[in-house]
Amino acid sequence: MNITVLAVGTKMPRWVDEAVAEYAKRFGRDVAYVLKEIKPEKRGAGVNAAQGMAAEEKRILEAIPQGAFLVVLDERGKAPTSVELAEHLKTWQQNGEHVCFVIGGADGMTDRLKQQARMMMRLSSLTLPHGMVRVLLTEQLYRAASILHNHPYHRE
C-alpha cells in the first residue's frame, strides 16, 4: 500500500523529522510511506491569505499522485478512532488505493481543494502546530497498520 503525506511547510525542528522517520520505518514492507514537503507561500508584500492558499493549492495539486484517494486534514473533518482509521486503511488497501493525506498551511486550504477530497479528517479539536500534526498523523497511520496486523502496539 502507498501512503503519501503532503505537508505545507519546510524546515521543521529536528525532533519532528526524527519522530516521523521513526514511525515511517516501522511500517515494514507492506506500506510505502512518503512525506513530501510543499513550499509555503510567503505572506506580506501584497500577498494575502487567500492568495497564499491559492498558490499553495497549485503546488499541492501538482504533488498529488495520479488517481490517489485524497484525504485532507481539516478542523471540520471527522475524527475517527484509531480502530476506525484502521478500518479505512484496510478498505484502501483492499481497493489498491494510493492514499494521499494533505496537511494545509498556516491559513488552511482553499475550499476548492477541500471539495476535491474524498474524505475530510481531523486529528483533534485542538489547534496543533504543523510539526505535531505530521508526527501524530504518521503515528496514527502506523497504529492503524499495527491494529490490522494484530501487533501489540495498540491496546484497547
UniProtKB/Swiss-Prot annotation:
UniProt keyword list: Cytoplasm, Methyltransferase, rRNA processing, S-adenosyl-L-methionine, Transferase
GO cellular component: cytoplasm
UniProt keyword Nucleotide-binding present: no
EC number: 2.1.1.177
Record localization: Cytoplasm
Catalytic EC class: transferase
Catalysed transformations (reactions): pseudouridine(1915) in 23S rRNA + S-adenosyl-L-methionine = N(3)-methylpseudouridine(1915) in 23S rRNA + S-adenosyl-L-homocysteine + H(+)
Disulfide cysteine pairs (residue numbers): none
Gene3D superfamilies per UniProt: 3.40.1280.10
Entry keyword S-adenosyl-L-methionine: yes
Residues reported in the UniProt entry to bind S-adenosyl-L-methionine: L73, G104, L123, S124, S125, L126, T127, L128
MF GO annotations: rRNA (pseudouridine-N3-)-methyltransferase activity
Primary localization class, coarse: cytoplasm
Its job: Specifically methylates the pseudouridine at position 1915 (m3Psi1915) in 23S rRNA.
Subunit structure: Homodimer.
PANTHER family: METHYLTRANSFERASE (PTHR33603), RIBOSOMAL RNA LARGE SUBUNIT METHYLTRANSFERASE H (PTHR33603:SF1)
Family statement: Belongs to the RNA methyltransferase RlmH family.
Protein name, UniProt field: Ribosomal RNA large subunit methyltransferase H
